[in-house]
C-alpha cells in the first residue's frame, strides 16, 4: 500500500522506530542493519516500506534500501519465516553477506539469527539459493558488466571483504581482478593489498 515514508526520525526502540510526518507518529518495524545506519534523532529520513495485515495485527516495516526491503519480502515467501524471523535474519549482517551465506549454503551464519534453527536455515537455503543473484563486477573497457557466479571461492572472498567493512561493489570489483587459481587466502591477501594502495 505504501511505497515509502519520509519524515522526522523521532525515537528508536528494540525493534521499531518512530517517524513523524504531518504531526502523526508512525511506528515502523525495522532491522538492526537499518537501525545501525540511521542518522541522529531529529533528522529527516526516508524508508522503503511494506505493510503486513493479519487478523490480529497490522504493521508497517521499513528499510533504508530497496535491496533490504526486497530481501525481507523474499524471506517472507519461506514457509515458517514470518516478519519477526525475517528482521532477525536481516539484523545479523548486511544484505550482501546474507545473500552470500544463502548462496553458499552456510547454515552456521544463518542460524546466528535468533529464532532461526537448523531446519529453517536449510529450508531458506533450499528455496532461495537459486533465486538469489549476486553481481560480480568486472571492467570491460568503457562499461562495467554484471554477471552471476557460483564459484564458492570467489563468493567466500567477497564475503570476507564485506565483513571487513568494504562495500559490495569494491569487494566484487577487486576480487574479480585477482587470480582465481590462487587459494582463498591468497586471493584475499591480494585483494587487501590492492585495496590498501
UniProtKB/Swiss-Prot annotation:
Q: Where in the cell is it found?
A: Cytoplasm
User: Which BP terms from GO are recorded?
Assistant: DNA recombination; DNA repair
Q: Which SMART domains match?
A: HhH1
| Region listing for Domain I, in residue ranges | 1-64
Entry GO CC:
cytoplasm; Holliday junction helicase complex; Holliday junction resolvase complex
- List UniProt keywords, sorted A-Z: Cytoplasm, DNA damage, DNA recombination, DNA repair, DNA-binding
**Which molecular function term from Gene Ontology is one that the record holds?**
four-way junction DNA binding
Q: Where is this region: Domain II?
A: 65-143
* Start and end residues of each stretch annotated as Domain III: 149-197
- InterPro entries according to UniProt: DNA_helicase_Holl-junc_RuvA_I, Hlx-hairpin-Hlx_DNA-bd_motif, NA-bd_OB-fold, RuvA, RuvA_2-like, RuvA_C, RuvA_C_sf
Location of region: Flexible linker: 144-148
Q: Which family does it belong to?
A: Belongs to the RuvA family.
Its quaternary structure?
Homotetramer. Forms an RuvA(8)-RuvB(12)-Holliday junction (HJ) complex. HJ DNA is sandwiched between 2 RuvA tetramers; dsDNA enters through RuvA and exits via RuvB. An RuvB hexamer assembles on each DNA strand where it exits the tetramer. Each RuvB hexamer is contacted by two RuvA subunits (via domain III) on 2 adjacent RuvB subunits; this complex drives branch migration. In the full resolvosome a probable DNA-RuvA(4)-RuvB(12)-RuvC(2) complex forms which resolves the HJ.
Q: What does this protein do?
A: The RuvA-RuvB-RuvC complex processes Holliday junction (HJ) DNA during genetic recombination and DNA repair, while the RuvA-RuvB complex plays an important role in the rescue of blocked DNA replication forks via replication fork reversal (RFR). RuvA specifically binds to HJ cruciform DNA, conferring on it an open structure. The RuvB hexamer acts as an ATP-dependent pump, pulling dsDNA into and through the RuvAB complex. HJ branch migration allows RuvC to scan DNA until it finds its consensus sequence, where it cleaves and resolves the cruciform DNA.
The record's note on its domains: Has three domains with a flexible linker between the domains II and III and assumes an 'L' shape. Domain III is highly mobile and contacts RuvB.
What protein name does the entry list? Holliday junction branch migration complex subunit RuvA
User: Which source organism does the UniProt entry give?
Assistant: Clostridium botulinum (strain 657 / Type Ba4)
**Phylogenetic lineage:** Bacteria, Bacillati, Bacillota, Clostridia, Eubacteriales
Q: Which gene encodes it?
A: ruvA
Amino acid at each position: 500500500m505504501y511505497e515509502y515514508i519520509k519524515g522526522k526520525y523521532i525515537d528508536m526502540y528494540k525493534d521499531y522506530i518512530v517517524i513523524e510526518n504531518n504531526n502523526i507518529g508512525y511506528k515502523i518495524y525495522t532491522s538492526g542493519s537499518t537501525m545501525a545506519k540511521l542518522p541522529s534523532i531529529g533528522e529527516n529520513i526516508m524508508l522503503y516500506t511494506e505493510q503486513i495485515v493479519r487478523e490480529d495485527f497490522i504493521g508497517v516495516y521499513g528499510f533504508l534500501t530497496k535491496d533490504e526491503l526486497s530481501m525481507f519480502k523474499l524471506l517472507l515467501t519461506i514457509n515458517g519465516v514470518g516478519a519477526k524471523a525475517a528482521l532477525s535474519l536481516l539484523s545479523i549482517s548486511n544484505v550482501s553477506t546474507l545473500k552470500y551465506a544463502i548462496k553458499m549454503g552456510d547454515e552456521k551464519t544463518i542460524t546466528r539469527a535468533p529464532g532461526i534453527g537448523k531446519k529453517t536455515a536449510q529450508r531458506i537455503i533450499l528455496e532461495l539459493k537459486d533465486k538469489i543473484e549476486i553481481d560480480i563486477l568486472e571492467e570491460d573497457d568503457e562499461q562495467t558488466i554484471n554477471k552471476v557466479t557460483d564459484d564458492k571461492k570467489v563468493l567466500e572472498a567477497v564475503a570476507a571483504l564485506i565483513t571487513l567493512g568494504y562495500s559490495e561493489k569494491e569487494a566484487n570489483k577487486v576480487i574479480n581482478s585477482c587470480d582465481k587459481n590462487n587459494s582463498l587466502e591468497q586471493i584475499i591477501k591480494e585483494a587487501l593489498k590492492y585495496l590498501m594502495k
